[in-house]
Amino acid sequence: MPKVTYDAIKGLVQKSGSGIELEGDIALTGGLTATGALSVTGSATLSAALIGSVDTRAEAGAVSLTKLTTLVTVTGGADRAITLAAGTAGQIKIIILTSKGGAGNAVLTPSVLEGGTTITFDAAGDAVVLVYTGAKWAVVSNIAAAIA
């Protein structure tokens, strides 16, 4: 498929390569769905909510790196060991313990954590917001979780 570019003066122009390239200001009415990565060079201004996808975890294991938020539930007396692999520099990850039934806690072990090695969630509502620095996960917000 040839590459199509839009130029404000020339209109649609066919070039070698593939994809679509748009230059100048673009007004979009309606929805836009991007499958795969969407890159924005420059500022992105949102006039409505930014809504990220959600991962739910009720068992031990790795939390999703491709979803913004992970909601964790714990039932029973045993701790839930959850892990978080290295991310991409600037990546944001939100983890919330939404429900707890029993004595067990959710214990998160990120690949590398600034200021500790684990984050323990022991009550519903405990939450952290993490940002990956390119070398480690940094806690930028913590609601009642224990970092050790």
List each language-model region with its residue ranges:
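Extracellular disulfide-bonded cysteine-rich modules/repeats
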Residues: 123-134
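Exposed extracellular interaction/assembly regions and N-terminal maturation sites
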Residues: 41-109, 133-148
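Short amphipathic beta-strand/extended segments with alternating polar/hydrophobic composition
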Residues: 21-25, 83, 122-123, 141-143
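Sterically constrained small-residue positions within well-ordered secondary structures
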Residues: 3, 86, 99, 120-121
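Beta-strand-connecting loops/turns
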Residues: 17, 90-92, 125
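Intrinsic low-complexity, repeat-rich intrinsically disordered segments enriched
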Residues: 1-68, 107-109, 113-116
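Viral virion structural and adsorption modules
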Residues: 2-5, 13, 121, 137, ...
